[in-house]
């Protein structure tokens, strides 16, 4: 059994026991969160109906926070001497899926 869940505007394929990195959430390590299911596949049946998915719960335990790779951004304007260099590291929260019920 697995589910497609939405978190932070992105979709992740999860099953029970999977560790997934989602966009940063404000919950502390050790707390439990609920993820929004978009699709649930249970062996032979596929469920994507909103009424049925309203009863399905995907729970996960927050393990901690991590950072993604450093991304370097360079803006350059020709003939004016304008250059701007900037860096960015996306923050993620690691969660472990504890259950898909419903």
Curated annotation (Swiss-Prot):
Keywords: Ribonucleoprotein, Ribosomal protein, RNA-binding, rRNA-binding
Name this polypeptide is given: Large ribosomal subunit protein bL21
Any GO CC annotation of this UniProt entry: ribonucleoprotein complex
Record note on quaternary structure: Part of the 50S ribosomal subunit. Contacts protein L20.
Chain's gene name: rplU
SS bonds (residue pairs): none
InterPro entries assigned to the protein according to its UniProt record, in alphabetical order: bL21-like (IPR028909), bL21-like_sf (IPR036164), Ribosomal_bL21 (IPR001787), Ribosomal_bL21_CS (IPR018258)
UniProt keyword annotation of Coiled coil present: no
Described purpose of this protein according to its UniProt entry: This protein binds to 23S rRNA in the presence of protein L20.
Pfam families the UniProt entry points to: Ribosomal_L21p
Assigned protein family: Belongs to the bacterial ribosomal protein bL21 family.
One example of a Gene Ontology biological process annotation: translation
Signal peptide feature range: none
A molecular function (GO) term: rRNA binding
Keyword Ribosomal protein: yes
Native species: Cutibacterium acnes (strain DSM 16379 / KPA171202)
